[in-house]
């Protein structure tokens, strides 16, 4: 997933392009935008400066803004081998999507009335509305995937008899684990998976006023918050470890506490007894010792610390496991998971593949989607009689940590959290808790991205004259001379401001994706040609930063529509506009040139000073060739400005006056 790419496009206001980047690697981004655990944010280097970029929330903004505009075209059938997918969770849906793109006829068999598996049955609607799942399911039908709901597969042999050449088992992990304590069969004790499934089907289980939830994972938090929404007056989570060891998403835990859920840490039930219509639960306090196999510190009972509590309902959410029908005749391993070949994903039966939670045990939606995509590739290999080609290259090399001195030079910008409903409002119903950014907030949050690995590199070492210009001008002190006297620019320290690229006299330095000075040059030449053909006057060229106010497109479009003769060249930072670009515009007849950059909202502190220095240098050149220095201006405006075009209006008026004066002078000469 090209996270940097789509975040950068959001920062420029190019939302539909950002959505295209997202969809190129994720078939169901709407689902991930709601429930992804965003491990990418844990790896975000912005956290070394202040807080990570809100990557998942930006994805949510992109899919909310443009999702309905992207229609999934039906895929062409190029293969005759039919494939059956048993189960319709995220792994099954992803596998169907990619197999259909490969040209296979695909049928999904789902035992329940609607597709989605745990997405629909196990995640509360305040986190993932059913209509979001419906939207992604619709894309499958648009592609030509055949869907058979209310169809429980009892025999794989029957599917083969029906002509299916490969089967993908993705039945999830819906079986709740037992607590293993006395009295857990008592009336009033239910399991978390069943409880969430019933609520998602529209049922309203009777819970009483006091509810205990046992567990510390995401399911336990979902159960507790759901119970509170169903009217329980008091909801207690009993968790045997401390909050630091709690595997649930920290954001979800915090929201549960805000909604009135209480968590009793270092407590576990040991016995349940039904008395006088209520549950008497005996608990014991725990202490933490050495880490266990999970890496978390192992809870140990404290002697003589037992105590009793009364509840109306106890909901156990201590884990889940797959429940594979015996008639499938599949080899089952640890945790009731299906055993597969780790490379081919084939089970002990020829033509039968398995994946998702049925193989891994409960995992994340993102992991299930990735597994479904891999399964599609492996099934294709099997049907085409190829052995899977396993890449030996490994993951892309990570960019190293920022140096402390670099961190000090990077501007601190507070993270913009997406808005959420207040606790008193969200605990009343199942409305979506987290709302979506507005346009300005999304653009500003995306601008916090450091664009790691997209900075400068010396592409043409033979051109480098070792003039040390880059060393002198870099505000982050990234370039250095190595032992051989060669300039090096470490990618982990470069902040992609582009100053060295614009100032390098030998043009030996370039910026990695997504910027290339050649693209700016080509765009400038295209605009200069169009301007010459239009004969609009006065002819003014504006180099506009694509971020901030310009990223929204508002100001640039305003100038294009209201100011005849203004031609906009988009750049990824005002500091990247080179002297050659400015002089080229004047060479081709421009009466005026301006550079428009961000004001106080700029993600970098040095942009304005760098641009102003370059403008002053070019103005001296203009004087030398007989042009007025005021023909070149720089503007720095923010989205918060009352009249961001005011300075430009004055500039256009000034250039218009110079243009008319030049006509008079020309007339006198003639």
How would you label these PLM feature ranges?
Residues 2-12, 19-22, 52-56, 81, ...:
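Beta1-alpha1 glycine-rich phosphate/pyrophosphate-binding loop at the start
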Residues 61-76, 135-150, 176-230, 332-350:
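Glycine-rich dinucleotide-binding loop and its adjacent helix/turn
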Residues 53, 59-82, 105, 120, ...:
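Flanking helices and flexible, charged tails adjoining ferredoxin-like Fe-S electron-transfer domains
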Residues 187-209, 292-362:
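FAD-site-proximal beta/loop scaffold in flavoenzymes
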Residues 1-12, 33-62, 107, 111-114, ...:
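Iron-sulfur cluster-binding cysteine motifs and their immediate structural context
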Residues 358-385:
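A conserved FAD-binding loop/helix module that cradles the flavin
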Residues 4-75, 139-141, 158-198, 433-443, ...:
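Glycine/serine-rich phosphate-binding loop and adjoining beta1-alpha1 elements at the start
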Residues 77, 82-86, 134-181, 271-282, ...:
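Feature captures the FAD/FMN-dependent oxidoreductase FAD-binding
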């Amino acid at each position: 997933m090209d996270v940097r790419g789509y975040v950068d496009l959001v920062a420029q206001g190019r939302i539909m392009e950002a959505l295209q980047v997202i969809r190129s690697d994720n078939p169901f981004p709407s689902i991930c935008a709601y429930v992804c655990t965003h491990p990418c944010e844990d790896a975000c280097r912005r956290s070394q400066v202040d807080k990570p970029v809100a990557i998942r929330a930006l994805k949510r903004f992109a899919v909310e803004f443009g999702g309905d505009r992207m229609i999934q075209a039906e895929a062409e059938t190029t293969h005759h081998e039919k494939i059956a997918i048993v189960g319709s969770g995220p792994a099954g849906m992803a596998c169907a999507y990619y197999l259909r793109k490969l040209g296979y006829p695909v049928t999904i068999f789902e035992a329940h009335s609607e597709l989605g598996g745990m997405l629909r049955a196990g995640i509360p609607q305040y986190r993932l509305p059913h209509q979001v799942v419906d939207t992604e399911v619709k894309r499958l039908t648009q592609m030509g995937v055949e869907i058979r709901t209310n169809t429980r597969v009892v025999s794989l042999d029957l599917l083969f008899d029906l002509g299916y050449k490969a089967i993908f088992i993705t039945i999830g992990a819906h079986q709740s684990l037992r607590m293993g304590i006395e009295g857990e069969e008592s009336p009033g004790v239910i399991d978390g998976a069943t409880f969430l499934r019933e609520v998602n089907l529209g049922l309203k289980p009777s819970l009483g006023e006091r509810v205990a939830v046992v567990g510390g994972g995401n399911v336990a938090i979902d159960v507790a918050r759901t119970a509170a929404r169903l009217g329980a007056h008091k909801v207690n989570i009993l968790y045997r470890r401390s909050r630091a060891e709690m595997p649930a998403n920290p954001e979800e835990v915090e929201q549960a506490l805000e909604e009135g859920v209480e968590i009793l840490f270092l407590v576990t039930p040991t016995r349940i007894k039904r008395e006088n219509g209520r549950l008497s639960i005996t608990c014991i306090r725990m202490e933490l010792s050495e880490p266990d196999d999970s890496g978390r510190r192992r809870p140990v009972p404290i002697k003589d610390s037992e105590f009793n509590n009364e509840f109306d309902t106890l909901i156990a959410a201590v884990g889940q496991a797959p429940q594979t029908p015996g008639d499938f005749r599949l080899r089952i391993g640890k945790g009731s998971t299906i055993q597969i070949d780790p490379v081919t994903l084939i089970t002990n039966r020829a033509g039968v593949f398995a994946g998702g939670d049925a193989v891994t045990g409960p995992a994340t939606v993102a992991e299930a989607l990735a597994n479904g995509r891999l399964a599609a590739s492996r099934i294709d290999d099997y049907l085409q009689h190829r052995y899977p080609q396993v890449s030996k290259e490994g993951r892309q090399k990570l960019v190293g940590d920022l140096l402390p001195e670099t961190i000090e030079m990077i501007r601190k910008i507070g993270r913009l959290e997406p808005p959420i409903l207040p606790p008193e409002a969200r605990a009343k119903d199942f409305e979506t808790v987290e709302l979506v950014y507005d346009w300005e907030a999304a653009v500003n949050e995306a601008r916090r991205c450091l664009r790691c690995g997209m900075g400068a590199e010396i592409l043409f070492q033979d051109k480098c004259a070792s003039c040390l210009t880059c060393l002198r001008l870099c505000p982050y002190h990234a370039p250095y001379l190595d032992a051989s006297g060669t300039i090096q620019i470490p990618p982990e320290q470069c902040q992609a401001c582009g100053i060295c690229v614009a100032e390098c006299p030998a043009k030996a330095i370039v910026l990695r994706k997504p910027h290339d000075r050649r693209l700016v040059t080509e765009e400038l030449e295209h605009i200069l040609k169009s301007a010459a053909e239009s004969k609009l006057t006065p002819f003014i060229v504006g180099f506009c930063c694509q971020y901030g106010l310009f990223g929204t497109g508002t100001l640039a479009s305003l100038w294009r529509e209201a100011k005849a003769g203004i031609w906009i060249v988009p750049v990824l930072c005002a500091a990247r506009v080179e002297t050659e670009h400015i002089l080229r515009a004047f060479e081709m007849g421009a009466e005026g040139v301006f550079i428009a950059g961000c004001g106080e909202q700029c993600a970098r502190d040095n942009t304005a000073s760098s641009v102003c220095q370059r403008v002053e240098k070019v103005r001296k050149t203009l004087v030398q060739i007989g042009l007025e220095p005021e023909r070149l201006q720089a503007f720095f405006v923010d989205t918060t400005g009352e009249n961001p075009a005011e300075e430009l209006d004055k500039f256009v008026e000034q250039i218009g006056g110079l243009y008319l004066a030049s006509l008079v002078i020309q007339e006198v000469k003639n």
